[in-house]
Amino acid sequence: MSRQINAATPSSSRHHRLSLSRRRINFTTPSEAQPSSSSRSQTSSSSRSHRRQERRQEQRVSEENVQIIGNVNEPLTRSYHRQGVTYNVHGEVNISNADPLLSQEDDVILINSENVDRERFPDISSQQYQNNIASETAAQRALQRALDLEAQLMNEIAPRSPVYSPSYAPNSPNYVIPQSPDLFASPQSSEQQQQSEPEEDVEVSCNICFTTFKDTKNVNSSFVTTTHCNHAVCFKCYVKIIMANSVYKCFCSATSSNCRVYNKHGYVEFMPIDVTRNQDSIKQHWRELLENNTVNNQTTDLNYVEQLQKELAELRAKTCQVEHKMTMLNSDYIMLKHKHAVAELDLQKANYDLQESTKKSEELQSTVNNLQEQLNKQVVESQAKFLEFERNNSDLVSKLQTVMSRR
């Protein structure tokens, strides 16, 4: 087995860079790709075409980096393309699959006599068909690489729209047979990649104040870095450190006063010129913000609504308290009414009792008067009786004395 290797030229190195983005092409054919018996018996016309094929192969070898494996006079059975280098295998050559030059990521084309399109080429031999297919494939690859390189150079010189692509008329010598959309695809530019990538909102926290910010990935950032390191902090912490120390010192000991603010177009470098310590400036700044920058601020509206809700809750609580007080006053009023009714009943009873007592007193007084009259009568009668008794007693005593004296 002989190998013919040409040195890499600048064009081949460009082909090497461009070929890294190409996809793998697999044309599956039977594993045993052996030339038929008709290919061994070549006619004079096939010999001439064979010589023309050799000259074309020599021209291609001079134009691009091509390695020929096997006997160049044998028919082309396989073709490998890897990292800008084309490997053409002629004849029956046993190649190990573990060969690093021919890994699974190579572009592989297997050719044998069964691939001949007899409808398009009814009279062509398998050798001529193999030569035509190989030359056509190599030409298409070379032309496509040239077009990709031209488009890349034009984009570097004068950037065009992402949908730009050169077009040629069908009769133009630069016309390429259309392939599938993902075949020989050129690498996308950075603008195309940014447009194709979906925007993703990511929550990132500061390592100093642990405040969480929500930014769009690869679009904007709320963090800044110094010009000497890539450790990011939030803008509030950067300003706080600058106000305290007049210079920013990162935890990696990088010291700088300048900072960089990033977005999808690049970065802006800021340098603090003057540090003025005035506590009233932030108050004035916030007064201006609240007057001019809170018209369409959803957070302010939410805060206002929340404040109104708090006031409404307080008013509801006060209303509940007033209702409770009114309920208590109503209950007290009802109790007082009940007490008043009871007092009136007590007064009526007292009046009734007083009337009854007065009546009883009058009755007792009349009874006492009657008894007094009876007593007076009895006293008079008793006095009269006593006087009568005394008189009778005196008469009896006198009579007794008289009787006694007579004895």
UniProtKB/Swiss-Prot annotation:
Enzyme class label: transferase
Which residue stretches belong to region Disordered? 1-69, 179-200
Zinc-finger ranges (RING-type): 206-254
PROSITE patterns tied to this protein: ZF_RING_1, ZF_RING_2
Reactions the enzyme catalyzes:
S-ubiquitinyl-[E2 ubiquitin-conjugating enzyme]-L-cysteine + [acceptor protein]-L-lysine = [E2 ubiquitin-conjugating enzyme]-L-cysteine + N(6)-ubiquitinyl-[acceptor protein]-L-lysine
Stretches with biased composition (Polar residues): 1-10
| Compartment(s) where it occurs, according to its Swiss-Prot or TrEMBL record | Host nucleus
Q: From the record, what ranges are coiled-coil? A: 127-158, 336-393
List the InterPro entries.
Answer: Znf_C3HC4_RING-type, Znf_RING, Znf_RING/FYVE/PHD, Znf_RING_CS
Q: Does the keyword Repeat apply?
A: no
Q: Which GO terms describe its biological process?
A: symbiont-mediated perturbation of host ubiquitin-like protein modification
Its recorded name reads: E3 ubiquitin-protein ligase IE2
Q: Which gene encodes it?
A: IE2
